[in-house]
């Protein structure tokens, strides 16, 4: 029989075909070396006797370790090939919102919190998150969004965030946001249900809200925008630090994203990013994710001689809003004109406030630029999509 017992890096000293750290070959065996791709050499022992066995512990250890390492190398090689193929391959292209899952590619939700999360040590909070996430996972498109019976603690957190931010909006938020904000009549003692908000958006811009259990895969989330659907979480951030959340929660979604989606020109801007994502390569999805980050999340717009915020990451963060206008500890962020065709900088979200904001002349101008970029990467096979039973040509 033939048995693979070792692998050698070519930098290792070889004496008479053996690694200097290996035991000599068993009597009756002949040594064969087979070169593998890359910098590895596979060593095989071919036994002429069926009774020959690995008698020494060191030999068996070499066999097990080497076999495991070889499997790891082969797995890495396969993964690298798959990643290279993904960069150019075209994934299945959704033709309607029904083709997009809101639960198969969740990057984090429920009780799966990292150690640096404020609620990591709060078992009851994690259970609560998990129960709310389950409501989103059972939701069917076309059915009313399940209501969440928010607790007094969750309402307290919501009210604190709302009362803190509302004082900054008149001077820091763009006029489109302020106009749309009035449509929702937010109150500090009541957390609005997603179904109520979705109905307002449907009447104003034709957009819908779909509940989601947690952070969606970027492709799924961006694909949803192409069907004028915004995926929103329903859970509330941990009460120990009401002005901070490491991931999207209902305060961020409702105060940051929802109002501005009632503005037709902004809705077109978000829609353009979504259209570009249909059938996009992994490389293009990564670029679109950055475009989304620097517009929908942290975008700014000229308003006369001032710069105002329209991104949800700004509008749901008291500290970020102030930083945008006056800087922090003597550091002033820079403002760069939005150009979707240029390489976007690394996204920053765990090392303090943004160092750079992208600036739009107007929502209409930004939407036009994003549509031009969308047309440049849109796959030929992406001809139209469906809103309900109505096909829309792209």
Swiss-Prot record:
The keyword Magnesium does not apply. Its main location: plastid. Keywords: Allosteric enzyme, Chloroplast, Iron, Metal-binding, Monooxygenase, Oxidoreductase, Phenylalanine catabolism, Plastid, Transit peptide. SUPFAM superfamilies: Aromatic aminoacid monoxygenases, catalytic and oligomerization domains. Fe cation binds at residues 252, 257, 297. It holds the Pfam family Biopterin_H. Disruption phenotype: Mutant plants accumulate phenylalanine and caffeic acid esters. The keyword Chloroplast applies. Residues 1-79 form a transit peptide. InterPro entries: ArAA_hydroxylase, ArAA_hydroxylase_Fe/CU_BS, ArAA_hydroxylase_sf, Aro-AA_hydroxylase_C_sf, Aromatic-AA_hydroxylase_C. It is an enzyme of class 1 (oxidoreductase). It comes from the Eukaryota. It is found in: Plastid, Chloroplast. One of its GO terms (molecular function) is phenylalanine 4-monooxygenase activity. Its cofactor is Fe(2+). Its EC number is 1.14.16.1. It catalyses: (6R)-L-erythro-5,6,7,8-tetrahydrobiopterin + L-phenylalanine + O2 = (4aS,6R)-4a-hydroxy-L-erythro-5,6,7,8-tetrahydrobiopterin + L-tyrosine. GO terms for cellular component: chloroplast. Residues 75-97 are annotated as: Disordered. GO terms for biological process: L-phenylalanine catabolic process. Catalyzes the hydroxylation of L-phenylalanine to L-tyrosine. Does not seem to be tetrahydropterin-dependent and shows preference for 10-formyltetrahydrofolate as cosubstrate and electron donor. Belongs to the biopterin-dependent aromatic amino acid hydroxylase family. Forms monomers. This is Phenylalanine 4-monooxygenase, chloroplastic.
